[in-house]
Swiss-Prot record:
Keyword Heme (UniProt): no
GO cellular component, one term: lipid droplet
CDD domains: Seipin
Compartments where found: Endoplasmic reticulum membrane; Lipid droplet
Stretches in topological domain Lumenal: 77-251
Region (Disordered): 346-370
Coiled-coil ranges per UniProt: none
Membrane disposition: Multi-pass membrane protein
Descriptive protein name: Seipin
Cytoplasmic side: 19-55, 273-370
Amino acid sequence: MNILLRLIVFALDPLGLGRRFLIRPAVNLGWNVYDRVRSKADEKVGTVRELVLRLGLIAFAVVLIIWLAVFMYAAFYYVYMPAISHTRPVHMQFKTCLETSTPCTFPHAHVSLTKKQQLLMVGQAYKVIVNIDMPESPQNLELGMFMVCAEMRDYDSMLRGHSCRSAMMRYRSPLIRMISTWVLSPLYVLGWKEEFQQVPVEIFSRYLEERQHPITDVYVEIQSQKIQFYTVTLHIVADFTGLRYIMFNWPVLSAIVAISTNLFFILVVFLLSWYHWSDAKWLHSVQIKYARLTKSLEPGVIHSKASSLRDDDDDLVAYSDKSDIADVGGDTLSDVDADDLVLVKKSRSGKRESPDALRKRPTKKTTADH
């Protein structure tokens, strides 16, 4: 097959002029064009890869910065903002008189806030409220005013706060009660509504928690033997002021402002760090100082430093010998002649010849005849 191709080529171009001046330049031109196209394609692929890599890095940096800003605000909100309220049921207890089957003592209860050391936040003001659900019975309507007292005690049962407040049911005239009863009678019949009033009694308006003596127990007492009630609950509500008030009442606005501020400061720190790390001169100097410090602690380096100091001493001795030789000869010597005249020979024991012995040696005349 190869022989046949060669014969065909020889028959078409016996002198090789076509191959030399037509085919070979065309093939070379084609290869050159192919190489250029391929190099440009590789460059484009490289630029596309670099562009994708840069975009990926920028996207990662943006996501990381936004996540850090959100995380910082969430962590600050979790640490700075306390729980808005704590609710505990109050189970009243009293002693019953055997003759009349009525309470002989005031209803009282012990409420355990927490088994831990602390429930409330130090420095935050709280409102302590006792809610009493009282039916609109004739006995409660005739009861009038009564007192509700509460004691705040710490883990060691030490008294940390005591307060009493008066309360009563809200007055409604017989006509208003009759009209409301007729209007709401379907709800009363279906059981969707009951005839009772919730009487809130604010025991403490601004109670402040102590760091050394946190409150763990509350003792509640209603100073009335004729009172009738369904349930009693204890509410401890945080009274926010200042920044906490803004963060609680306008959470979206405060979150936007705080996250934007965090983004600004994080971007400033990021740009300063980028500018600082882009200049590698200080890093190179630190590496050199660290290398010098680590090498100075190595015994081999210490030995080399000691040997260099000895070499410096030898140079000083040689220089002094040059000056001595110049003084003895009385003529001005060049540095080369002085180096030739200074003969510092070491014996096998490592001793030097003294300068006096060197002065006794015959010196050659270095002055030129004029």
